[in-house]
Curated annotation (Swiss-Prot):
Known role: Forms part of the ribosomal stalk, playing a central role in the interaction of the ribosome with GTP-bound translation factors.
GO MF annotation: an example: large ribosomal subunit rRNA binding
CDD domains: Ribosomal_L10
NCBIfam families referenced in this protein's UniProt entry, alphabetically: PRK00099.1-1
Organism of derivation: Rhodopseudomonas palustris (strain TIE-1)
PROSITE patterns reported for this sequence: RIBOSOMAL_L10 (PS01109)
Record's signal peptide: none
Subunit annotation: Part of the ribosomal stalk of the 50S ribosomal subunit. The N-terminus interacts with L11 and the large rRNA to form the base of the stalk. The C-terminus forms an elongated spine to which L12 dimers bind in a sequential fashion forming a multimeric L10(L12)X complex.
UniProt keyword terms in alphabetical order: Ribonucleoprotein, Ribosomal protein, RNA-binding, rRNA-binding
Protein name: Large ribosomal subunit protein uL10
Length: 172
């Protein structure tokens, strides 16, 4: 790799690390190309990304970023998964690791907080931002639905009583 290409790769990675809220580091040795493509697709669908780069260049790119604490994890064949949603990358990484034993999660970072393997798994078990929004909307809408049901219930009961009385009058 030429010096200019290395500089460009470092700048690209640094830009990615500046905008990410979570970074997960894992070993991928032994994965097939098809498995790596599947991982990339799953990450992309979740709104995350996967990067494989030289560890030395990645360490240089990490300098001055919130996720700089993952530097010591970059040893051997590593892949870095990042996302702006704090739950997206960990969730996909943990699910992928369950299906592929050759994909080994080493740890990660959420902002300036360093995560070990258990921390990544705990983060993956949390609901995503979209799921939390859906729950919040459901909680806000529930009282309005209840009020509508309570206000229409007496009118419906009255209508049924009148209908029953009218049916009784016609039958007699």
């Amino acid at each position: 790799m030429e010096r200019a290409a290395k500089k460009e790769a470092v700048e690209s990675l640094n830009g990615l690390f500046q905008t990410t809220s979570v970074a997960i580091v894992a070993h991928y040795s032994g994965l097939t190309v098809a498995q790596m493509q599947k991982l990339r697709q799953q990450m992309k669908q979740a709104g995350a990304s996967v990067k494989v780069s030289k560890n030395r260049l990645a360490k240089i790119a990490l300098e001055g970023t919130d996720v700089a604490a993952i530097g010591p994890l970059l040893k051997g064949p590593t892949v870095i998964a990042t996302s702006s949603d704090p739950v997206a990358a960990p969730k996909v990484a943990v699910e992928f690791a369950k299906a592929n034993e050759k994909f080994v999660i080493l740890g990660g970072s959420m902002g300036t907080t360093v995560l070990n393997v258990d921390g990544v798994k705990a983060l993956a078990s949390l609901p995503s931002l979209d799921e939390l929004r859906a729950k919040l909307v459901g909680l806000v809408q529930a009282p309005a639905t209840k009020i509508a049901q309570v206000t229409t219930a007496p009118a419906a009961k009255l209508a049924r009583v009148v209908q029953a009385y009218a049916s009784k009058s016609e039958a007699a």
